[in-house]
């Protein structure tokens, strides 16, 4: 898999390119008895050391870039690695099936659950089909339909958040985008079953919140959660998107900062270099946290779940 190095990772990319070149030469030179294994190993150790150094001191803007990484695992990747027996459910039973939201029945360690999440695309056609992970009202209404189904059958709900925001097109507004988001916020706060939400990439504004009201809210180490994108904030405050790095630092969009503010419960560590470097490792860590959360919430009655969720929402903004 191509790692698609970001701008701040270019020193690592240069080392990796040298490693690839030497490895190719070594393979071709086997017939000539040329052995470059020691040099390749030295460069690999240097690359690892450099990666550790760079990732030990990332700024908010660099983390925002990682949250948007084109190879970052999406909802369907986690469904494939964490769950079994996934059966996708489609449509909002009112207008259409929005491909920017996926969801359905699945099992985690044999336990039935309802899984719902934003889904971006990787290739151009898939990105367009998924609308770049920006749901329309029918996407949020589909999500709510699945949540209400889960409540009827007493199934825990697990959501994965990864969107730049709700789709702002004219058609979406005409079909009631703000109403769909507001309804989800209200209804999720009343659900009588456990709800566990995890930000796996971008957590963009109301588009993220519409499936983000939970008993437990987790964030991956290099994910972000904010009311507006850094570029959008910079355009408003400084009239220039070039100030996005400054805006990202000021907005407090990173997982550690949001945990300090008690807006999220757990920050899940990612593999060195980010989740895109090792799908298996990040899926294992995420699954372990989901199982911990489920076990904790299992001890609560439906009334306790709703009351705790209400108190959680009411204390936002007070630290």
Curated annotation (Swiss-Prot):
Keywords: ATP-binding, Cytoplasm, Fatty acid biosynthesis, Fatty acid metabolism, Lipid biosynthesis, Lipid metabolism, Nucleotide-binding, Transferase. Residues 35-296 form the CoA carboxyltransferase C-terminal domain. PROSITE patterns: COA_CT_CTER. Its EC number is 2.1.3.15. It is an enzyme of class 2 (transferase). It is found in: Cytoplasm. Its main location: cytoplasm. Pfam families: ACCA. InterPro entries: Acetyl_CoA_COase_a_su, ClpP/crotonase-like_dom_sf, COA_CT_C. One of its GO terms (cellular component) is acetyl-CoA carboxylase complex. GO terms for molecular function: acetyl-CoA carboxylase activity; ATP binding; carboxyl- or carbamoyltransferase activity. SUPFAM superfamilies: ClpP/crotonase. It catalyses: N(6)-carboxybiotinyl-L-lysyl-[protein] + acetyl-CoA = N(6)-biotinyl-L-lysyl-[protein] + malonyl-CoA. Component of the acetyl coenzyme A carboxylase (ACC) complex. First, biotin carboxylase catalyzes the carboxylation of biotin on its carrier protein (BCCP) and then the CO(2) group is transferred by the carboxyltransferase to acetyl-CoA to form malonyl-CoA. Acetyl-CoA carboxylase is a heterohexamer composed of biotin carboxyl carrier protein (AccB), biotin carboxylase (AccC) and two subunits each of ACCase subunit alpha (AccA) and ACCase subunit beta (AccD). This is Acetyl-coenzyme A carboxylase carboxyl transferase subunit alpha. It comes from Photorhabdus laumondii subsp. laumondii (strain DSM 15139 / CIP 105565 / TT01). The lineage of its organism: Bacteria, Pseudomonadati, Pseudomonadota, Gammaproteobacteria, Enterobacterales. The gene is accA.
């Amino acid at each position: 898999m191509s790692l698609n190095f970001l701008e701040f990772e270019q020193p690592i990319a240069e080392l990796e390119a040298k490693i690839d070149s030497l490895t190719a030469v070594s393979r071709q030179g086997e017939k000539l008895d040329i052995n470059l294994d020691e040099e390749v190993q030295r460069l690999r150790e240097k690359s690892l050391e450099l990666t550790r150094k760079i990732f030990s001191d990332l700024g908010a803007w660099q983390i925002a870039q990682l949250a948007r990484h084109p190879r970052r695992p999406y909802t369907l990747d986690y469904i494939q690695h964490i769950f079994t027996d996934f059966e996708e459910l489609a449509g909002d039973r009112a207008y259409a099936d929005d491909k920017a939201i996926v969801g359905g029945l699945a099992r985690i360690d044999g336990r039935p659950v309802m899984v719902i999440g934003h889904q971006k695309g990787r290739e151009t056609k898939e990105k367009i089909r998924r609308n770049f992970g920006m749901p329309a009202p029918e996407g949020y209404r589909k999500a709510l339909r699945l949540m209400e189904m889960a409540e009827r059958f007493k199934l825990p709900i697990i959501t994965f958040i990864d969107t730049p925001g709700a789709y702002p097109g004219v058609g979406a507004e005409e079909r009631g985008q703000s109403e769909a988001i507001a309804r989800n916020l209200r209804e999720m706060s009343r659900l009588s079953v456990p709800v566990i939400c995890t930000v796996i990439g971008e957590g963009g504004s109301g588009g993220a919140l519409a499936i983000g009201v939970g008993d437990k809210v987790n964030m991956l180490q290099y994910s972000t959660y904010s009311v507006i994108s850094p570029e959008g904030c910079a355009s408003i405050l400084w009239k220039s998107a070039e100030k996005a790095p400054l805006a990202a630092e000021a907005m407090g969009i990173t997982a550690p900062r949001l945990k300090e503010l008690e807006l999220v419960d757990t920050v899940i560590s990612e593999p060195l270099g980010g989740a895109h470097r090792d799908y298996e490792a990040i899926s294992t860590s995420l699954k372990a946290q989901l199982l911990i959360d489920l076990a904790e919430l299992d001890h609560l009655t439906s009334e306790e779940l709703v009351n705790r969720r209400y108190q959680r929402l009411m204390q936002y903004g007070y630290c």
